[in-house]
Amino acid sequence: MNIQALLSEKVRQAMIAAGAPADCEPQVRQSAKVQFGDYQANGMMAVAKKLGMAPRQLAEQVLTHLDLNGIASKVEIAGPGFINIFLDPAFLAEHVQQALASDRLGVATPEKQTIVVDYSAPNVAKEMHVGHLRSTIIGDAAVRTLEFLGHKVIRANHVGDWGTQFGMLIAWLEKQQQENAGEMELADLEGFYRDAKKHYDEDEEFAERARNYVVKLQSGDEYFREMWRKLVDITMTQNQITYDRLNVTLTRDDVMGESLYNPMLPGIVADLKAKGLAVESEGATVVFLDEFKNKEGEPMGVIIQKKDGGYLYTTTDIACAKYRYETLHADRVLYYIDSRQHQHLMQAWAIVRKAGYVPESVPLEHHMFGMMLGKDGKPFKTRAGGTVKLADLLDEALERARRLVAEKNPDMPADELEKLANAVGIGAVKYADLSKNRTTDYIFDWDNMLAFEGNTAPYMQYAYTRVLSVFRKAEINEEQLAAAPVIIREDREAQLAARLLQFEETLTVVAREGTPHVMCAYLYDLAGLFSGFYEHCPILSAENEEVRNSRLKLAQLTAKTLKLGLDTLGIETVERM
């Protein structure tokens, strides 16, 4: 149920009847304050100016045509021409009933699209570090939301599995296997990469062999392809452990590494030349873009093939966008890549559009994000100044949550404590990130993220268990409750009901903008409204059974909404805390 969309259409029709143009924008928004109703239509200012009349005069005319019978109990004009809409309690009650009767809580499915989501993208032969956290969990929240809404989502894990460093890595893997009698497990990927690089820098014979191996790998030699595949397998097996711990939905089947696009690169360069978009410049192949200027104010040259014949990330990203449209049949492509890559992506996509590889009707969207910073405001590092491994961060989250949970539940059985600590610890790390606007940098702070008050995972998980505890005390089953009517008489009941019915609007914003913090803010607000409702509207000690059951149903929809909302974020809920 999208009340905002329903009201927008009603107000728009009334505006047209009052003389506004057919493309007028009613600008219906959720009201910021209770005294302004549940929704406010702010579109009179802009339209009145075009019509040469006072906004309040237009608002008065709109009201004569606005039929919100059965939807609103009161509609009033405020200030210079805002229209405040107060929802009818009977309308709220009816739609709370409908939401409870639906597995999807009354959320409609929009027109189905095929949406490719590019996220996570770790590198082969390197361990995942904190720099991979934001892309992985923000991207996964977008995927979960889009899938819930009914879209066909293709997860694309754009793994860094190609490049000149693979000659060095294969040579080192070969050396290790010879010295360790055949098969070996790479327990320490970081150490493996570091040792390979050290040998490459210090041993000229090893470096020469590594350079030869690159050529053989790139020419498709089966032995070197096999060694390369082994490195990819070892890395992705380790990464899968991290994905599973993080409760993200990525699997090995979602890997679409850089190497996938290699066969396309020569054809793309040739095609861009044939179309007159790419030219030779100082031995390299370059596309000059008028949209981007260099320091001299001239069109910027973007290299797509080096003079030695090598390709660049830009070439791969052009091929990647083309593949996602032509082969995966994407209607929309979302990239969860940090903000420092913005110009690079814009240049690649400008070439993609000019070449006609992806039509303008298919959006290519860079859902960029800021950096994770330490308390000192600098990039998050270890005490020694090194990169923080993601596995180490999750270990610490689990350890801190374990202590916290044990403190509050000294008699909890060990297996239950471990399960709860995992949900709280991992949930805290994820929620702390997801609850911030992704476009900004944010400060990583253990004390804040593990607090049981404020907009945190432990608070949200606790809020959910608190609602469930009402049901345990009520000793009533869902079947008995289903037949009971919802009656809304108190203001706090109406406020909670209206907020519950705004779940679809919240999902729609997250799906459109890729902003999970909007869902976090909604759920936190919902938990606060339930808290006020619980305090001022007695549930179990209500004046009669009808009121008791009605309030239990509001509590029931709150629990279901909190659980489903947290699930779209990839945050686990627990029954007891």
Swiss-Prot record:
Protein known as: Arginine--tRNA ligase
Swiss-Prot/TrEMBL keywords: Aminoacyl-tRNA synthetase, ATP-binding, Cytoplasm, Ligase, Nucleotide-binding, Protein biosynthesis
Gene designation per UniProt: argS
Enzyme class (EC, first level): ligase
Lineage, opening ranks: Bacteria, Pseudomonadati, Pseudomonadota, Gammaproteobacteria, Enterobacterales
EC number of the protein: 6.1.1.19
InterPro entries: aa-tRNA-synth_I_CS (IPR001412), Arg-tRNA-ligase (IPR001278), Arg-tRNA-synth_N (IPR005148), Arg-tRNA-synth_N_sf (IPR036695), ArgRS_core (IPR035684), DALR_anticod-bd (IPR008909), Rossmann-like_a/b/a_fold (IPR014729), tRNAsynth_Ia_anticodon-bd (IPR009080)
Biological process according to GO: arginyl-tRNA aminoacylation
Family designation: Belongs to the class-I aminoacyl-tRNA synthetase family.
Motif 'HIGH' region: positions: 122-132
Nucleotidyltransferase is among the record's keywords: no
Cellular component terms (Gene Ontology): cytoplasm
NCBIfam families, sorted: argS
UniProt-annotated location(s): Cytoplasm
Gene3D superfamilies for this protein: Arginyl tRNA synthetase N-terminal domain (3.30.1360.70), HUPs (3.40.50.620), Isoleucyl-tRNA Synthetase, Domain 1 (1.10.730.10)
